[in-house]
Amino acid sequence: MLCLPVFIILLLLASPAAPNPLEKRIQSDLIRAALEDADMKTGEREILNIIDSISDVAKQICCQITVDCCVLDEE
């Protein structure tokens, strides 16, 4: 008589529907990390700094190749 309820409880615990605490914690950590990554946005100032850096490098390369770029910057 007692074996049937114990068997049912063990069957429920061993079923794939029962969440594994470690897997559940890992999933929640991954979800939290994904949400934090989604909140990170590149600021407009950072984008402008990157564009300015690329522009400076392009000007240096242009000045090494031809004088026309350097003359335009000085005027």
From Swiss-Prot:
Molecular function terms, GO-annotated: ion channel inhibitor activity; toxin activity
Propiece residues: 20-59
Modified positions (Pyrrolidone carboxylic acid) in chain numbering: Q60
Free-text tissue specificity from the UniProt record: Expressed by the venom duct.
Pfam families on file: Conotoxin
CC terms in the record's Gene Ontology section: extracellular region
Reported modifications of this chain: Contains 2 disulfide bonds that can be either 'C1-C3, C2-C4' or 'C1-C4, C2-C3', since these disulfide connectivities have been observed for conotoxins with cysteine framework V (for examples, see AC P0DQQ7 and AC P81755).
UniProt keyword list: Disulfide bond, Neurotoxin, Pyrrolidone carboxylic acid, Secreted, Signal, Toxin
Keyword Iron belongs to the record: no
Disulfide bonds: none
Leader sequence residues: 1-19
Disulfide bond found in the keyword field: yes
Subcellular location: Secreted
Family affiliation: Belongs to the conotoxin T superfamily.
Entry's free-text remark on domains: The cysteine framework is V (CC-CC).
Protein name from the UniProt record: Conotoxin Vn5.6
